[in-house]
Design a protein with these regions (language model features):
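Solvent-exposed alpha-helices and their adjacent loops that cap or buttress functional pockets
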Residues: 4-6, 29-30, 82-85, 106, ...
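Short glycine/serine/threonine-rich phosphate/pyrophosphate-binding segments
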Residues: 45-47, 97-104, 122-125, 243
Length: 347
């Protein structure tokens, strides 16, 4: 069996009202004098004062760059500025876009990357993979974060929709792992049982606790820890296999056909409903869990048109033809896609 490299975060801190400790956290990871921060404008307004005070106390100079979009030009512009600043660390603060951009820039410049999520909408906060706009409408491999720093109090203040989206990304591990097993059985590809079990555990945790979440509200810290665990599973696997299967290809296909429809985790959750039925899994259980946590289970809820959904299912596998999924075993037509969506009440 060929070897693969595991890149894991060195330190993960999850706390409440601990953003003031960011300076000492960074120094514990790597003694540094200059860092570059990447965030959106709203996030900067919320956390700038406390973060800069902590960095000053730790004698760290920072350069702050705003990521208004995640297209190639924005990434290249920020990357050029980070290189010129001679920063020793690249920090991504915010949701998926800023964390992904910082992760990719750190990889391109061979600089350590640190993840500081301010929302929990997907599992990329601790994984080595990024989703950016470009020629390939799917995740690219970059590098795992050197550290992950989470202030749960900040994430609690983010819109509830973002946390529910994170739940959709978690439940996607059910179909992703099954697709990985298919790849092992049909093509002989490497299958990491431990990383697969770790990813599955995050999804099973959500299903097991969905009723509690529906009655008492989503437990932010638990969801965050599950997302981090899923990200670490992909680090151990050396690929996104345990976390990303046909349901993610469906999400990427929707992005390609109609950008801006739904959040990543929302599309993955809906994709999981569809793909789980194709796989012969308990799709009704998945629907119930998603409803319990307030995540969408229908195309209408995220503004996804039936014709776009159908087309997305027919082209999803073509986005990554080398990755074996259940879609390789189905002659998916738009008519079959509509029938599948109606049978699962996605349409």
């Amino acid at each position: 069996m060929p070897s693969h490299t595991m890149e894991l975060p060195r330190q993960i801190v999850v706390g409440e009202k601990n953003i003031d400790d960011i300076g000492s956290f960074l120094n514990s990871l790597k003694k540094t004098k200059k860092i570059s921060l990447v965030s959106g404008s709203n996030v900067k307004k919320i956390v700038q004062k406390k973060i800069e005070a902590s960095l000053i106390a730790s004698k760290i100079k920072c350069y702050w760059y705003l990521a208004k979009t995640n297209d190639q030009k924005t990434i290249q512009d920020i990357e050029k500025k980070v290189r010129q600043s001679k920063s020793e660390l690249v920090i991504g603060i915010g949701g998926g876009r800023s964390v992904d951009i910082a992760k990719l820039i750190g990889f391109n410049l061979n600089k350590p990357f640190v993840s500081i999520p301010t929302s929990a909408s997907h599992d990329g906060i601790a994984s080595p993979f990024v989703s950016v706009k470009g020629d390939k409408p799917h995740s690219l491999v970059a590098t795992a974060p050197l550290g992950v720093f989470v202030d749960v109090d900040i994430i609690k203040k983010a819109p509830k929709r973002l946390l529910a989206s994170g739940c959709g990304d978690l439940i996607a591990k059910i179909t992703a792992v099954r697709d990985w097993q298919l790849g092992r059985d049909k093509t002989g590809e490497y299958y990491g049982r431990y990383s697969a079990e770790l990813a599955s555990m995050s999804a099973k945790f959500l299903i097991k606790n969905s009723v509690r979440f529906s009655k008492k509200g989503l437990h932010v810290r638990e969801i965050v820890e599950a997302l981090i665990s899923a990200g670490v599973a992909s680090c151990i696997a050396g690929s996104s296999r345990p976390c990303s299967g046909a349901e993610h290809l469906f999400s990427h296909a929707v992005d390609k056909l109609e950008p801006g429809v739904g959040l990543h985790g929302e599309k993955c959750g809906i994709g999981t409903i569809l793909i789980s039925k194709l796989q012969g899994q308990n799709w009704k259980q998945i629907v119930k869990a998603l409803k319990d946590v307030g995540a969408p289970t229908t195309a209408k809820e995220i503004g996804l048109k039936p014709e776009v959904l159908a087309k997305a299912l027919t082209i999803a596998q073509s986005l990554r033809p080398e990755r074996y999924t259940i879609l390789k075993e189905v002659d998916m037509t738009e008519k079959k896609a509509i029938s599948l969506a109606k049978s699962t009440k996605v349409l």
